[in-house]
Amino acid sequence: MPGHGAWVASNEPPGAVHRVAWMDQVVAPFSAGRTCGGNGAADPVRVSVHEALAYLHSLKQFGFQPGLETTRRMAAAAGNPERRLRFIHVAGTNGKGSVCAYLDAIYRAAGLRTGLYTSPHLVRFGERIQVSRSPLSDADLARHVGELRAMVETLPGLVPTFFEFTTILALRVFAEAGVELVLWETGLGGRLDSTNIVSPLASVITNVGLDHQQVLGATLAQIAVEKAGIIKAGVPVVTGADDPDARAIIEFRARELDAPVLGVGAPEVAMLKDPVGLVGPHQKSNAAVAAATVRLLRALIPVSDSQLREGLASVRWPGRLQEVRRGNQSLWLDGAHNLPGVLALKAALPDVMPVGRPALVMGMLADKDWPTMARILAPLASRIVVVPVPSSRTVSTEALRSAAIAAGAGRPVRAAGSLSEALRWVTADPVVLITGSLYLIGEAVTLLGLESSAGDGERTLNEWSPPGTLPPA
């Protein structure tokens, strides 16, 4: 496994903090006029949502720093809100957000007030933290960030990362809202992930695949060790992992901790003869993992078969093989952003596009296995438009275009300067697939004028007609 130093994505020693001038400008609104109350804690300052978001993004310079000490210190200073909550903790290379969405829909169908913590967001930060599928409002975001920032300033030497701060923010929101169950998605890995400070009712490991190898390890076995790090003593485990080595590691760790392991069984297979709300064989697998988790916890949280079916059928999770109609044109948005995700997308396409090939609009990040991803996707398309992803980590359109030409078996390939330009180029194509990065899907959701976190009673991506942002097909 990688040593501790290999986990820090910079040349600084582990835990080092490099403060830059622009950060002082960003956080100034949080410090201006700050006084301390009688208990020694800094009084919160009113900040705007723009100031709150600027502060949150300033924390991204500290990258990913593995370990739980900072998160535990923050949780203790905040009064350990996690101790007042019940959790289902979900890890996995792919599908963990979808499994959380299925579980959230099922337990809401059973009448529970739920908390949903996932990442990343597509458009708005509040999508990460939802109470009964209502995203955190801008006003509540600003209030909580101001209060939590004030608290952090009282803790000597503590400089949280973006995800550490966001995790404690979520715990505060859920405790204040009085949610009855939290669907709690890991950020990266599991063992050293900030979410791993909780004691859940169940631990779920959806699957294990190759992603984030520079952090989690180069092999499936190494990555499985990190995912299995969420397993707690005596807490049951549900897994859909089918790789033999990964499954063996998960089961070995569970035995060490006297944690029973449950896989997908006959009841879930029978249940999945009914329709589910998300598209593709991989989403059937995710639904089965969610259903197995519900079955495991029925003694603690009763859920009827009809409520389970209702939740599975009603779930919405934008950007996961979701269809947008634009006149007679179908645009499919899928956030496949790593090799396992692209393989799952390829397997699902015959179900949603049984005739013909789509025009493919794709952009990818440079720290993924993008050459292999492009090699898999290019032959599936009628023609290809490559675009930059709205991230500093984007693959250049020149490099991605070359990879697509090499793999595309003579299909036309163009490079667009932006996604909006690419969408104008494909207005005449009856079917368009946009994929390669969740950041790209977030940009598409914005351009198409869609609501990115549809809950019950709202129009889903399947039902939206874009409000004139782009010319009709």
Predicted regions mapped to residue ranges:
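A glycine-rich beta-strand to alpha-helix segment
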Residues: 422-450
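ATP-dependent carboxylate-amine ligase catalytic core
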Residues: 43-46, 62-64, 68-84, 109-198, ...
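Conserved catalytic-core segment of NTP-binding enzymes
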Residues: 187-194, 198-258, 360, 370-372
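N-terminal leader/targeting and accessory segments in enzymes
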Residues: 5-13, 17-94, 98-113, 122-123, ...
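C-terminal helical cap/extension that packs against the catalytic core
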Residues: 240-262, 295, 330-333, 339, ...
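Short, flexible loop segments at boundaries between secondary-structure elements
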Residues: 389-391, 455-473
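Nucleotide phosphate-binding/pyrophosphate-handling subdomain across enzymes
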Residues: 84, 181-186, 193-204, 208-209, ...
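Hydrophobic alpha-helical packing residues
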Residues: 103-108, 174, 377, 404
